[in-house]
Every structure is written in C-alpha cells, then in structure tokens.
C-alpha cells in the first residue's frame, strides 16, 4: 500500500516543500487547500498533479480539519499515515508596546490556533492505526530571537504544544517531531528572484529534502530537528524535546 501524507497549509512556502518531499519518497499527498484557485496554484508550484489529492477546508475554523478527517474515515478521501502541519505566516513587525489586541489575536489565530486545531483533529486518527505513523510541525526560530513580538509569542506557544505532544506520544505509534527552521524558505519561482537571493532564501524544492530525510529516519522521535543552515537540510541535527530539568 502506498502511504499518504496529509499536508496542512499546502500552498504556503513550507507546505509546498512538504508536498515535494513527500512525493519524492514515493508517497501520495492529501493537500488541504483554501479554494479552487489554490488547487491550480499548488499543482503549478509542486510541478505536478500526479499523486496529489486536494480537499478544501477552512483550517482557521475549529472544525475545518475535523471535517477532512471525517471524510477520510467515511472513505471519501484517501487514508493518511503522516501529517505535516505547515500553517502560519502572519509576520507583523509592530513593537510589543504598540501591538494592538487585534494584531495579537491575528498572530495567535493564524500561527498557533490553526496548529492546535490541526493536531487535535488528526492525532486520534493516527493513534488508531496499528502501524507506525508520523506527525511533523514546522516552527520558526523567531520565537527565540524575538525581533517580531507578535509572531515570536505565537511560536513560543507552539514550542510548548510540541513539548506536550512529545510527552503524550512518547510511548505510542506516532513519531511526533518539531522541525525548527532558522532561515527563509520560498517557493522556487520566488526564491530565484534577485532580492530573495540576496537574503539567502532557500528554494522550497531544496528544503524538501529535510522532510525526505526525516521520514527515512525512524530513530528520530519526540525531537526538535534544528535547521539552522542549508547544510542542516541533508545532515539532520536533533535533540529530544523531553524536559531535562534545570541546568547543572
């Protein structure tokens, strides 16, 4: 049986990368998209439509992804064994003292709430399977750097979600991991532009290798994978997210 990866946020820079990586491993993709226009965009950016099934859902809604899982259970969509959550993207640069409640909520809603909804909707389905499954969430180093307070706070919350998920799945069939990214990634058609090149942007098709490598390494479980430089894409570095206590 050919396995399937559910990609949430499939038309974003990281989502497209996950789609490409999954297809390279000879797996199929179930891509969650916003609307019909996003379907055409995904096929263009991924460079193919082969092996990709799309489903429209509002991932910002509390029940949007649950409706997708329900369709899978009812046989209306392909079964999936892997989840890649790549939702987010709000990047307000407003200083903390000037951040409005509206902007704060927008950052938390898009960058954190959607990831929580994704985990809650899919984890039970992964746990119900008899074979090994995986759940991967992408986070950004901005939560530690802190230069953009709105996004930074949302990433801090997402780090904690990952710690709780690691603890809950430590002795289960689900291989939960956090992929921690510290440099910009863009879809190929954007990454090759002169301004992006000056910023050191990495192409989504290159970053895709990080997911290929993670899927192949069964020993990486309950960990944070550090992607600090492009060199880390092919030589994954990771450490357990388990609580280690105070520093010695």
From Swiss-Prot:
GO terms for molecular function: oxidoreductase activity. Its EC number is 1.1.1.-. It holds the Pfam family adh_short. It comes from the Eukaryota. The keyword Oxidoreductase applies. NADP(+) binds at residues 14, 35, 41, 58, 120, 187. CDD domains: SDR_c. InterPro entries: NAD(P)-bd_dom_sf, SDR_fam. Induction: Expression is co-regulated with the other genes from the iso-A82775C biosynthesis cluster and probably controlled by the cluster-specific transcription factors iacI and iacK. Pathway: Secondary metabolite biosynthesis. Belongs to the short-chain dehydrogenases/reductases (SDR) family. Short-chain dehydrogenase/reductase; part of the gene cluster that mediates the biosynthesis of iso-A82775C, a enylepoxycyclohexane and biosynthetic precursor of the chloropestolide anticancer natural products. Within the cluster, the prenyltransferase iacE prenylates siccayne to generate pestalodiol E, using dimethylallyl diphosphate (DMAPP) as cosubstrate. The probable oxidoreductase iacF is then involved in the epoxidation of pestalodiol F to pestalodiol F, which is further converted to pestalofone A by the short-chain dehydrogenase/reductase iacG. This is Short-chain dehydrogenase/reductase iacG. It comes from Pestalotiopsis fici (strain W106-1 / CGMCC3.15140). The lineage of its organism: Eukaryota, Fungi, Dikarya, Ascomycota, Pezizomycotina. The gene is iacG.
